[in-house]
Amino acid sequence: MIMASSAAASISMITLRNLSRNHQSHQSTFLGFSRSFHNQRISSNSPGLSTRARSTTSSTGGFFRTICSSSSNDYSRPTKIQELNVYEFNEGDRNSPAVLKLGKKPDQLCLGDLVPFTNKLYTGDLTKRIGITAGLCVLIQHVPEKKGDRFEASYSFYFGDYGHISVQGPYLTYEDTFLAITGGSGVFEGAYGQVKLRQLVYPTKLFYTFYLKGVAADLPVELTGKHVEPSKEVKPAAEAQATQPGATIANFTN
């Protein structure tokens, strides 16, 4: 078991180095229907017909106004924007990422290659371990003029008992980007909006700012403290890394 764990960790670190090497290599090279009354030969001059027509039109209009009003009330969502900052770190101990090769070059990332991953999450102030990310990236474009790559990403952020947030969109190795918030659970139920991703150290250190809409209640205070300004040098508090009492949220996702 120890040897297997060591081997898996070694493979993970090799994958991280290959991702970084692939990134560095670019620096050197790269949404009615209608019906006619003419054929039915019905005279529109008939008083009875006109009265019935007006009555029907009035009733129909009232019906649709009622339906539309009801639908609007049923599907209205909170539009207040709530901000949430989190850090993501790959600390080399989750056997992540992996690379599933679909391209023809075994020694470098190719279009279509799949990169499943899971990393650790910390609060924006770096004092508490809150959970993990888990998802999948697909390499869709080499961008030589930017000296990097473009991935299409679909993944989730897990916050223990608080629930999770799912996102989807572009992941760029060379600049900041925005992804769509596609939903959530727990305190994040009904969430939508966008999240800004800041690449601090590719691919091991990232900073996210969520602009959350659709969440009825205020976010938990322990998730929304003042964040540490992002930089390449930031790191979690030692107590949070060690998941000591008081340095994690309740039942954090591991």
UniProtKB/Swiss-Prot annotation:
It catalyses: (9Z,13S,15Z)-12,13-epoxyoctadeca-9,11,15-trienoate = (9S,13S,15Z)-12-oxophyto-10,15-dienoate. Induction: Low local and systemic induction by wounding. Highly expressed in fully developed leaves. One of its GO terms (molecular function) is allene-oxide cyclase activity. It is found in: Plastid, Chloroplast. Its EC number is 5.3.99.6. GO terms for biological process: jasmonic acid biosynthetic process. One of its GO terms (cellular component) is extracellular region. Residues 1-52 form a transit peptide. Signal peptide: none annotated. It is an enzyme of class 5 (isomerase). Keywords: Chloroplast, Isomerase, Plastid, Transit peptide. InterPro entries: Allene_ox_cyc, Allene_oxi_cyc_Dirigent, Allene_oxi_cyc_sf. It comes from the Eukaryota. Belongs to the allene oxide cyclase family. Involved in the production of 12-oxo-phytodienoic acid (OPDA), a precursor of jasmonic acid. PANTHER family: ALLENE OXIDE CYCLASE 4, CHLOROPLASTIC. The four allene oxide cyclase proteins (AOC1, AOC2, AOC3 and AOC4) are encoded by duplicated genes. They are very similar, and most experiments involving antibodies do not discriminate between the different members. This is Allene oxide cyclase 4, chloroplastic. It comes from Arabidopsis thaliana.
